[in-house]
């Protein structure tokens, strides 16, 4: 009840601000009184601002994910927890090389997968034997978390940890109180033994453990550990400070509100309330006036765009030629940082324990391109702070003869996010020509258009939530790209089968004779239900079948539907293969088209 009283009192202050010229802002969360009108709710939404931690996080703009662990050495995306710790043995581990490469790319924070779903811990934890302490690396005396944190501190980079609640190795997983205590203990170790941690990242994966049971996570206890040990850290994805953008493709929303009724999972009624509003992390509309009118509460809950520089999240040598091009990375930058989000780009180290040369080179190219593009503001005037209301516009001179193709707009989000619709025009040969238009601005909005040489640009705020505060405007020229994208041959044998014997389960005579088989590939169709769990069998005669791999799932394929490479530990000889889908990404058993499967022969 105290919160409702506070909000009602605050509303009174806001309404009275027109007379007193006082300004009142509220951090992070507002709960609406049942009697509030749509206009009153909107006014409060305009007053909602980030916490200090959220604001400092937003200013980072570029953050890096490091997926490194047992999967690096098994070639999988999701390990099953049965892997031997001895498999983890990087031959030339150098965390400082990671940090230097990231710094050259312009990244301000690095987040390490301290434990992925396989349960293998990259620090010598006291909670399990499944850790670096029982690996061959450094004779069991290594600590990836320590070495990366030391390197980050040395080079002035912020540091975060990813700790997977889903643990496919822990025997106690599924025994909720016991496992929750183990997880709390792991959090304690990570958050109390390595200095300051700036972001703690939880995903929502909750599959079965080694005993076939699922776990009920004690989020409240987990958050309490973070708040008590690292009060300045933001809690991401399953926390209430930073939300997932809703895809792993590097795509932000054209309309991206940091002020949203979307409830984080920290709230007990999150599922019911989000269902009532018809919204989720992947919803297109997360902050419209209509949603706010229907909402019981609103939150400052900004977007983080996570995507990998490669098709997979962990390192796979066959993807060395599939590192995203410079042009693709720049597109992602414009669609994340340039759409009111923070970019979290994954760069997976290889089996040496190094960021591969291809990735490191691409990071350097990316950093140089972004730095050079935004180092030269083509505007003739630099003081651009502007307080505006619906319909207001302002003109800015461009340096004589300068060509531009990019405009930057920023709101002062410490005074709320308020712009709903805007347009950008250029004065060309005496006429105003529309260059770009958009909806939300937020912390930063970047707009691209064809090369022009205007005398002026004009920014018009067509719709705002009361008065908007524009803190920065810039006009820039982004140079064209001169590189082509990389291609990779997906399969060594791809669809050129001697005969398809059966479609469900898919049974194929590969070449009409026995051949060497070293693995297979699956190219998913993300427009239909995809295969998730499967059995892949080989035969020399079509009667007796063997299963060459214990891997029976395409890990993370639902969120990241890229070609899957499954390599066997030992090469096989076979004429026939059979692929049986036991579970699809939506719970069904989809049929696989023969053209989606390829065989790796070398």
Predicted feature locations:
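Solvent-exposed serine/threonine-rich low-complexity stretches and specific carbohydrate-binding patches
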Residues: 434-442, 547-556
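Mature catalytic domains of secreted/periplasmic carbohydrate-active enzymes
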Residues: 23-451, 460-480, 526, 568, ...
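Exposed beta-strand and adjacent loop surfaces of beta-rich binding modules
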Residues: 404, 419-423, 517, 531-535, ...
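Asp-box/BNR beta-propeller loop motif
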Residues: 1, 427-433, 539-548
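Predominantly extracellular/luminal regions of secreted and cell-surface proteins
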Residues: 296, 480-498
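Extended extracellular/luminal ectodomain segments enriched in beta-structured repeat modules
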Residues: 400-406, 454, 512-519, 573-575
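Non-catalytic, beta-strand-enriched accessory regions in extracellular/secretory proteins
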Residues: 391-396, 503-509
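Bacterial Sec-dependent N-terminal signal peptides
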Residues: 1-26
